[in-house]
Structure formats: structure tokens, C-alpha cells
Amino acid sequence: YLKHKGKRFRAFQGEYAYHFISWRYAKFRWKYIEDDVLRKGDALVLSVPFSGNGGDLKNIDKILKKCTRLKIPVLIDCCYSPLATNMSFNFDHPCIEYVSFSLSKIFPVGHLRIGMRLSRTDDDDQLFVYKSFNYKNRLSMKIGLDLIKKFDHDYI
């Protein structure tokens, strides 16, 4: 969020509540997509699958093409992807800056903060700095690795 703190954050109603809580707490500007059109100067967060219905969002490719055209950065939040089956999504849209994953929706490990963020570029933010100094929560990583080795994504 900090990289785009000067932008207006956007998300659909039904998006994962963590984002709205974070934006409110940090006093970031934000608005539901349903309440205004996407504009240059926005930053978009989308969950895949969509947390509001567990499935696809309508017109997602059209929205991402508009984001590319308007240079709107997009974070794809895949925290619910382990719960999805037969999911298909095109991550090739140039507007997509980050893709994040979490194990806390499939396993009871929320306090271990097991997840990862993928990025097209090294923009030297906090996570890249931590990684460059090899600061990693190895215990959480090991627990997460053991869980995904032992249990299929649809075990629960």
C-alpha cells in the first residue's frame, strides 16, 4: 500500500475486509468501484477468486485492460485461491504489479503470517530489503511447507 499511498485505492464491495480496514487505519483515500469509474491516479486491489462470491468477477479482463490503458497499478490477492477448483486467470496484464498468496485461508495458521508476494520488478521496498538480508520467518516457512506437502488444497 505504501508504494501507492498518494493514489485512491479501489476495490469491489465484497472484497476481503483486510484491505478496507488497512486503508481506513492508514487514512488512505479509497472508494468502491461500484461508486465511481476507474480513473488515472487510482490503485486497484482484486481478489482471485473474488472473496465476495468465491468465483469470478464479471468483466475482469475488460477492467484489467482499462487499468493497463490508464496506468492503474493492480494487486491480485490470491488468498482464497487454495479453496478454488478449476480456477483460470490471466496474470499477463501489464497493469498487474503484485500477486500475493496466503496459507491462512486453507490452514489455521493466521498468526504465523505464511504467505508470499510476487512482483514483476524489484522496487526496493520493505519486503525486498528483508529478502536481500535473508530475513525470513523460517519456522513459519517450514510449517507452511510441511502443511502443503502433507495435505491437498481441498483437504479441509
Label each PLM-derived region with a short phrase.
Residues F28-P82:
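Active-site phosphate-binding strand-loop segment of PLP-dependent enzymes
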Residues Y1, A11, V37-A43, Y130-K131, ...:
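Catalytic phosphate/metal-binding cores of nucleic-acid and nucleotide-processing enzymes, i.e., regions
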Residues N86-F101:
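A short alpha/beta connector and helix-capping loop motif
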